[in-house]
Structure formats: C-alpha cells, structure tokens
Amino acid sequence: VVGNGGNYATLTVHTKRNGVWTETLSCSARVGKNGITGNKREGDGKTPRGIYSLGQAFGLAGNPGTSRSWLQVNNNHYWVDDVNSSYYNKLVDASQTGIQWNSAEHLISYPTAYRYAIAVNYNTACTRGAGSAIFLHCSTGRATAGCISVSQNDMVRILKMLQGDTLIGIYQNKNSLY
C-alpha cells in the first residue's frame, strides 16, 4: 500500500512464483482520513506505516473462497478499542466474555466495510493507546479511521490470493519504499 500524501493510496499485490515476484493486482485504496504515519495513536484517523502480517479473516458474508480461517461475524463480535480494557485491540465474542469495555467496534454494525475483511496484525502487543482495529476491508466510498479499504471486488480477489505468510507493507509515499 503506497499513499499519496493524503487519504488515497494504491494497493499492489505481488506473488512469488518459481522464485520470481510478479504483480498480480493493482487497485485504488483509501487509508486513514489523516493519512499514513509512523507514530500511530488511538483515534488519530491515521493508518500505521510499516510491514505487518495478516490475522483473522472475517466478514458479515460467508467465506468468499479464502484459504485463511474465516469468521462469519454475528451480533456477539466486537473489536475492542477501549484503552482501559484488558481486551484492548482484541476480537472478542461477547457471548463468551460479557461486555468488559466502554468502547468497541461492533463488527456487525458495519455491513458494507466488513462484508469482507482481514485484520492487519498491528499493535499485537496491545500497547494501550498505540491504535487498534486496523483492517483491510471493503470500501465505503470515503477515507477510513485508520484502516485500508478497497472495492468489494478487489477485496474478494485479495482474500482468494492470500497465503499463510502474506505480508502487507504500508508506506507514506513511493519515496519511502527505498
């Protein structure tokens, strides 16, 4: 993902076949409403710069054909963004935990964005205030609160391409690639 200095970006997928990297998809993307940063903070509207593995694939729709473990979201699924909760930056099933937070994304409440999505493994140490709930998800037609979004068709294509060792690189601009 390469930003343009604002909240637009280009997402490019490269696949390694027989030792050779090949571009297999390039598409328009949106990032945080306040751009991309190397100093992400909770609620800043910025997408975190860096290279990350990918976590749980999920969505309100059924598995679109990804080989990754798929969670079909229901009314009990939340991603906690309350910095004072022991569940900060974690996916939880409230039927198992109860509500032990003051703020969280109720995943089913975002039917367009989270029709198909995958977690970006950002802040997996759950450092309070460093940012939470960073996903690659379907576009809603506007900038995100810190996630990366692409069209639903591109999101499905990406999910189908994912391998277990897939990484996502997020860069502020082309110059920061080198």
Over which residues does each language-model region extend?
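Extended catalytic/binding region for NAD+/ADP-ribose chemistry, centered on the ART fold
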Residues: 146-150
